[in-house]
C-alpha cells in the first residue's frame, strides 16, 4: 500500500521524521514521548571475529550488523508504543546509544507521538 493510499488512522514508517513537523500535515494533538529500547550484547564468537577484523582495519561488519539490528528493533518498538498511544505520526525522532557494561549496549529510539491531519491546500 502506498503512502497516498494509506489511511491517516495508520502509523507508517513514512510518517516518522526527525523534523519537528510533518510536511503537508498539521499536528492536531501531541500524545507524548514514544520510545523503544533494546539492550544488546556481543557474543564471545562475535567479539573474537570482530577482533580479527580490527587487525586489517576498515569497517567491522560484525559490529555494523549488530548496530543495524539493534536500531531496527528499537525503531519497531517505538512504532508499537506510538500506536498504543493512538498516534498516526512521530516527529522529532532520534536515536541514542550508551554502553552500560562491558560489551553491553543500550539503543533507544524516541520521538513525539502525534496525531496529524492533511494540511489545507496540501
From Swiss-Prot:
SUPFAM superfamilies: YbjQ-like. It comes from the Bacteria. InterPro entries: UPF0145_dom_sf, UPF0145_YbjQ-like. PANTHER family: UPF0145 PROTEIN SCO3412, UPF0145 PROTEIN YBJQ. Belongs to the UPF0145 family. This is UPF0145 protein BceJ2315_57450.
Amino acid at each position: 500500500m502506498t503512502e497516498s493510499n494509506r489511511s491517516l488512522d495508520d502509523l507508517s514508517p513514512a510518517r516518522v521524521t526527525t523534523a519537528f513537523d510533518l510536511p503537508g500535515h498539521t499536528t492536531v494533538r501531541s500524545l507524548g514521548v514514544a520510545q523503544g529500547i533494546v539492550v544488546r550484547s556481543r557474543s564471545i564468537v562475535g567479539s573474537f571475529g570482530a577482533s580479527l577484523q580490527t587487525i586489517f582495519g576498515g569497517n567491522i561488519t560484525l559490529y555494523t550488523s549488530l548496530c543495524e539490528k539493534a536500531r531496527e528493533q528499537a525503531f519497531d518498538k517505538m512504532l508499537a508504543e506510538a500506536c498504543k498511544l493512538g498516534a498516526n505520526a512521530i516527529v522529532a525522532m532520534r536515536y541514542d546509544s550508551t554502553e552500560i557494561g562491558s560489551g553491553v549496549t543500550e539503543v533507544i529510539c524516541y520521538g513525539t507521538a502525534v496525531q496529524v491531519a492533511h494540511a489545507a491546500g496540501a
